[in-house]
Amino acid sequence: MSGGTEMAGRFHGRRVLVVGGAHGIGAACAARFARDGAQVAVADLDVEAARATVEKLEGSDAGQDVAVQMDMTDRSSVDAAVAEVVEHLGGLDVLANVAGGDDTGYPPFEDLDDETWARMLDWNLLGAVRTIRAALPHLRASDHGAVVSVSSVNALMAFGGPPYSAAKLGLLAVTKNLATEFAADGIRVNAVAPGTVRTRVWGEDGKDSEQMRHMYPLGRVGEPEDIAAAVAFLASDDASWITGHTLPVDGGVLLRGPGPGTLG
């Protein structure tokens, strides 16, 4: 799944929407899809950053790429953004749900109020539900419909952060159920579960991620491009007989377990 010229063009003619594509993993996904020949739409609450990401895209259809504003916690915003993307691209073949995160700071359980739980569920679970619902009619019209959502290793093992972990585990349950329901439409639904990735959250300067390196059997934390490669694989025809599954992209951390500290 690593980058390579042999993969170039495998998304030629495909229309891809990356939700949460302005920064980090989302921006890497947008770049990977564009490099592999797709027309790419980048949706993000920060539309200026989304436009900056689109301007950097390189690929055969780069001139047709578009940035749109989307607040995934607001159904009307999601519906309007997807409609704008479909109007611009002429349809939709792939939905990559990358947006989400955890801003709780991992407090003790008793300090997590209902509002925090609701915010984490809205951001990390219901947002993806909204985007899938809005995209579904257009994915049904595609011959290559695929949904790939970014979950977390927190959904698979206890690394801390119960609200975030519960939301990401819920996303995996949605993935399995929709894979079954959408199979008759030819739509595949899968997810990836990253470990710690070097993004703005974990310190792009390397300080925070260096402190966590010891937790990973492969000796490093992930890069956004590691996750983008897995997302692109699951969205591609190379995974045409894979649906309803979650692919850990975690440097082997699930083999070792939580150990000291927590992950995000």
Question: Locations of the language-model features?
Answer:
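Active-site loop of short-chain dehydrogenase/reductase
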Residues: 14, 62-64, 90-92, 139-152, ...
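Alpha-helical segment proximal to the catalytic Tyr-Lys
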Residues: 137, 180-184, 240
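Catalytic loop of short-chain dehydrogenase/reductase
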Residues: 102, 148-170, 175-184, 196
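C-terminal helical subdomain
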Residues: 2, 191, 210-242, 249-251
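Substrate-binding pocket helix/loop in short-chain dehydrogenase/reductase
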Residues: 105-109, 113-118, 212
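Short C-terminal tail/terminal secondary-structure segment
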Residues: 2-7, 106, 232, 243-264
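Canonical Rossmann dinucleotide-binding motif of NAD(H)/NADP(H)-dependent dehydrogenases/reductases
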Residues: 9-41
